[in-house]
């Protein structure tokens, strides 16, 4: 667990497969009371989510937080756009990186830190299909080498 992060509630494994992660930034999320209860129960899905910057503010889009079971009328829309809490300097830095560079912001993981929900946002560049195949091939080769070393050392 890097950067002093707490209990990991959700991870976006697909993001590391589909993108080259250039840089990561930790951000807070503005949630309602029933949403934080669902997040603490790990009922959050980051798979199709992304972040965008509008009017000098960062927003988390397409992240699904399941409705809290006992929340009835207080539950918010599960797919609503949520504000990210970042410093102005971080927002301008990310905005400059995103301009005309083919980069995007993807949520990598959600975790609790000192009782607050935090999201790790990655500044990412899309991978081509051959990059994905190369990554899978390299991972398989490393796995085979470890297996052979384990077998060799067991003698």
Swiss-Prot record:
Keywords: Cytoplasm, RNA-binding. It is found in: Cytoplasm. One of its GO terms (cellular component) is cytosol. Residues 135-147 have a biased composition (Basic and acidic residues). One of its GO terms (molecular function) is RNA binding. Its main location: cytoplasm. Residues 135-155 are annotated as: Disordered. InterPro entries: SmpB, SsrA-bd_prot, SsrA-bd_prot_CS. It comes from the Bacteria. GO terms for biological process: trans-translation. NCBIfam families: PRK05422.1, smpB. Required for rescue of stalled ribosomes mediated by trans-translation. Binds to transfer-messenger RNA (tmRNA), required for stable association of tmRNA with ribosomes. tmRNA and SmpB together mimic tRNA shape, replacing the anticodon stem-loop with SmpB. tmRNA is encoded by the ssrA gene; the 2 termini fold to resemble tRNA(Ala) and it encodes a 'tag peptide', a short internal open reading frame. During trans-translation Ala-aminoacylated tmRNA acts like a tRNA, entering the A-site of stalled ribosomes, displacing the stalled mRNA. Belongs to the SmpB family. PANTHER family: SSRA-BINDING PROTEIN, TMRNA-BINDING COMPONENT OF TRANS-TRANSLATION TAGGING COMPLEX. This is SsrA-binding protein. It comes from Streptococcus pyogenes serotype M3 (strain ATCC BAA-595 / MGAS315).
């Amino acid at each position: 667990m890097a950067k002093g992060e707490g209990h990991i509630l959700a991870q976006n494994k697909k993001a590391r497969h589909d993108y080259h992660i250039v840089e990561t930034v930790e951000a807070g999320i503005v949630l309602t009371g029933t949403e934080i209860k669902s997040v603490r129960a790990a009922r959050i899905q980051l798979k199709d989510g992304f972040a965008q910057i509008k009017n000098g503010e960062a927003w988390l889009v397409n992240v699904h937080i399941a409705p809290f079971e006992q929340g009835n009328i207080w539950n918010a829309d599960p797919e609503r756009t949520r504000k990210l809490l970042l410093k102005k300097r971080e927002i301008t830095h990310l905005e400059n990186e995103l301009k005309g560079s083919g980069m995007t912001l993807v949520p990598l993981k959600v975790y609790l830190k000192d009782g607050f929900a935090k999201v790790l946002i990655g500044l990412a560049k899309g991978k081509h299909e051959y990059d994905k195949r190369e990554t899978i091939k390299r991972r398989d080769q490393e796995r085979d080498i470890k297996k052979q070393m384990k077998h060799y050392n067991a003698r």
